[in-house]
Design a protein with these regions (language model features):
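Catalytic active-site module of serine/aspartate enzymes centered on a nucleophile-bearing elbow/loop
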Residues: 138-172
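Ligand-binding pocket scaffold of soluble enzyme catalytic domains
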Residues: 32, 36-42, 62, 68-78, ...
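Helix-loop "lid/cap" segments that line or gate small-molecule binding pockets
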Residues: 45-59, 65-72, 85-91
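Conserved serine/cysteine hydrolase catalytic core
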Residues: 57, 75-136, 143, 147
Length: 172
């Protein structure tokens, strides 16, 4: 039985407001094109861009751990190519967009399950005004704000831990 849902930087789709398609030549446009095979499977750009975006927050040991499953070029890196291709952007791929839209609608309608929204500021996925307004409308929810980008858990782990520690005892 689910007693509560805590989330941060979740992939959520407000009604009628899908994330825009990637701009031509952007990182996600490259990942989703034939050029993605070289960029991700051979050059490991997905993992390396994640690490470079967290430069000040990851130790060398942390960065090595992020790289560890993907040290060998080729198919070992396939999950890091599949994921950006499955992320619903511009309503595509349709099956993923519909799945995300369905669970987003469920989260918005549910009143029984307590929710904790750990808002990352400045954040990324939930920084769009329509996305932020949508999740703030979820019922039976508390919100806390912590500093960080999309990978907020690497930037503010202690603040997230404190928020969870304060929220968990409120669950029945």
């Amino acid at each position: 039985r689910v007693k509560g849902i805590a989330y941060m930087e979740a992939i959520i789709e407000p009604p009628g407001a899908p994330r825009p398609a990637p701009a031509p030549g952007s990182t996600f446009d490259i990942y989703r094109s034939a050029r993605g095979e070289q960029a991700v499977l051979q050059e490991n750009r997905f993992v390396e861009s994640l690490i470079s975006g967290l430069d000040y927050y990851l130790t060398d040991a942390d960065a090595a751990e992020y790289r560890r499953p993907y040290l060998t070029p080729g198919e070992s890196r396939r999950p890091t190519l599949t994921w950006p291709r499955e992320l619903p952007l511009g309503g595509e791929p349709r099956h993923t967009y519909e799945l995300v839209r369905d669970y987003s609608d469920w989260l918005a309608a549910d009143t029984a399950i307590p929710k904790l929204f750990v808002r990352a500021a400045p954040g990324a996925l939930l920084a769009r005004p329509e996305a932020l307004a949508f999740v703030r409308g979820f019922k039976n929810q508390r919100e806390v704000t912590v500093y960080g980008p999309h990978f907020v858990q690497e930037v503010s782990p202690d603040a997230i831990g404190r928020a969870l520690a304060a929220w968990l005892p409120t669950l029945r």
